[in-house]
Amino acid sequence: VMARSWTPQARAERFEAAQRERHELADRIGRTLAAELNDRQVEGGGWHHQVAPVNFVSVLLEHPSGMSLSLVHEGSYRKGAADRRLTVRGGYPSEYCGWRAEPMTVGIDTSATSKARQIIRRLLPSYQRTFVAARTMQQRVQ
């Protein structure tokens, strides 16, 4: 027996189903994008993903070198195609406060191949340069 659509139980069930769906989407995006970066030997491969336990799509791609890329759905208030975008940012050591690569967006619904191509072309060149600077600065401080 299904709960009536307006009851607290029904709302909770819808919320949990939507949360499960977002988590599965994030896992699929992370898994396929990590595989794509590894297939393309980006930074020699070794990328893996983690899904953040939050109520929106949030994936962290991590590399053994310490590099990381976060893909986060930040625009749930947006309408139309703008609502179907993920913001991609490079990760840096927490104590680093220098220049950072400019974030970019990719379509949630685009293929992993398309996402990887866009990230490699638009974000990675500046991220690699600024990440090396951050690591150099971090090593000097230690």
Q: Which residues are covered by each model-predicted region?
A:
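Intrinsically disordered, low-complexity regulatory segments enriched in Ser/Thr/Pro
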Residues: V1-R11, G44-Q118
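Negatively charged, low-complexity tracts enriched in Asp/Glu with abundant Ser/Thr
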Residues: M2-H63, T130-Q142
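Glycine-rich and polybasic anion-binding loops at the starts of cofactor/ligand-binding domains
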Residues: Y127
